C-alpha cells in the first residue's frame, strides 16, 4: 500500500517557555503566522475568548497553563489564601467558552492537584506546572490514538476515500496532531485518502482558514467548499464519509460541535454516508444524560456581518450567532476516542475505562 508522510510536520499551538506561554495566533492565519506571548491568567482568558487559541482540547491545555500563570501571580505563602485566589482565577478562565467541556475538565484537574498538594505554596505551583505539562503531553498521545482507531473505523470500501470535515480539528485545535483531522492525517499516511473536502465554516471560517492551511502545509489534497455546498457534493457522490470533532458530548452520544455540524449529519444520513465524531474522552460530559443540557455559546453578531474590516450586511437588521449546535446521537455512526470507536449507545461503557 502506498504511504504518505504527514507525521513529522507538527504544529504546537500552545507552548511553555521561560515561565510564560506562547500561543500561535490563529486569528492571523493563514495570511500571517505568528505567536502571542501570554504572561498572565487574564491575558490567557482574553486569548481564549477572542479565539487566538481555539479548539476544545487546545483550550483545555491553554487553561491549564493559564492556571500556572495565575499561581505565579498570587502573593501569599498561606495555602488557604492561595487556593482562594486560585479558585477566582479558575472561575475567570471558566467563563471564557461555556460549551467546550475540556476547559472545565482541565481547570478542575488543576484545582484538584492544588487542593491535594502539601501546605507549601512553592510545591503547589511546581505541581501545577507539572500537571499542565502532563495534560499537554497526554493530549498529543490521545490524538494519535484517536487517529489510529479512526483509521480502523473507516469504511473498507472504497479503498481510497474522500472525506468531508467541518471547522478545524487538527493540530491547531489540540495539543498537536488533531482529532478528526488526526484521523484524516492517519488515513493519508496509510495511503487511504484521496482528498479532503473542507467546509469553510461560517462565520469565522476555521475550515477555509485553518483546516485548509494545515492540509496544504502537509501536502494533503484539500478542496474548500462553502457550507451550503456539502449536500450537493454528497448528492454528486464526491464524498465517502464525514468526520467532525466535538466540543462536548453527552452520555447518550448527543454531540455539540461547531455550528453547521447538525446540518451535515442530517444530509449525510439522507445520502447513507457514515458520520463520525472524533474526540477524546475528556470531551464527554457523562453528567449530562443528553444534549439538551449542553450550554450553547452565543457570540458577537459582528462575526456574521463583518469579515476583517469589510461589512457584508445592512446593520439595521438582527443577527443570531450561536457558536455550536447539537447533533443527535441517532445521526452518528461512531464516536472515535482514544479507547476505540464505539456507537453512541456504547459510549457509556467507556466512562470508567
Swiss-Prot record:
| InterPro entries reported in the protein's UniProt record | IF-2B-related, IF-M1Pi, IF_2B-like_C, Initiation_fac_2B_a/b/d, M1Pi_N, NagB/RpiA_transferase-like
Q: What one GO molecular function would you report for this record?
A: S-methyl-5-thioribose-1-phosphate isomerase activity
Q: Quick check: keyword Amino-acid biosynthesis in the entry?
A: yes
Provide the catalytic activity annotation: 5-(methylsulfanyl)-alpha-D-ribose 1-phosphate = 5-(methylsulfanyl)-D-ribulose 1-phosphate
Give the UniProt keywords, A-Z: Amino-acid biosynthesis, Isomerase, Methionine biosynthesis
Q: Which residues are the active-site ones?
A: 247
Quote the Gene3D superfamilies the UniProt record gives: translation initiation factor eif-2b, domain 1, Translation initiation factor eif-2b, domain 2
Q: Which SUPFAM superfamilies match?
A: NagB/RpiA/CoA transferase-like (SSF100950)
Annotated metabolic or biological route of this protein: Amino-acid biosynthesis; L-methionine biosynthesis via salvage pathway; L-methionine from S-methyl-5-thio-alpha-D-ribose 1-phosphate: step 1/6
Q: Does the keyword Membrane apply?
A: no
Residues the record marks as site: Transition state stabilizer: 167
According to its UniProt record, the EC number is 5.3.1.23
Binding, substrate: 54-56, 97, 206, 257-258
Which EC class, in a word? isomerase
HAMAP family in the record, alphabetically?
Salvage_MtnA
- NCBIfam families to which the protein is assigned, alphabetical: eIF-2B_rel (TIGR00524), PRK05720.1 (NF004326), salvage_mtnA (TIGR00512)
Give the function comment from the record: Catalyzes the interconversion of methylthioribose-1-phosphate (MTR-1-P) into methylthioribulose-1-phosphate (MTRu-1-P).
**PANTHER family in the cross-refs:** METHYLTHIORIBOSE-1-PHOSPHATE ISOMERASE (PTHR43475:SF1)
In its UniProt entry, what is this protein called?
Methylthioribose-1-phosphate isomerase
